[in-house]
Amino acid sequence: MPPFEEIDNTADWAFRVSAPSSEALFTEAAEALYRMSGVLMEPASEKIRKIHLSADDRESLFIQWLNELVFLLDRDRLALHGIQIDQLTDTLLSISGHPAEVRSVGKYVKAATYSGIKITQTDGVWQATVVLDV
């Protein structure tokens, strides 16, 4: 099964991402966001950028994570490469990644939405369904 698949959505974009762990779910979702947006990046920097987020629950944390990536793309024209999860609980996320300048974006995402957000674990496979406002 591929790590993500686009889902038909009338007004926005939606995707379902699958991974063998909750940590991998967050990194695969970042990849899905970049690929669906058509992000082309320069080679990654040797620098490390750390991001720390907190939320009330795992679904909110997941949406905050994707919106942080959207913010970095929009404001700084940066994407993260080689993302590693340093800490992940139901309410806390700490990641490290190498920032890369974005050469081009095919289509900008305004935000990841809470519409239909769902994270599940079945038979050792984690899945999340996300709707993006474009």
Enumerate the language-model features and the residues they cover.
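Intrinsically disordered, low-complexity regions
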Residues: 1-134
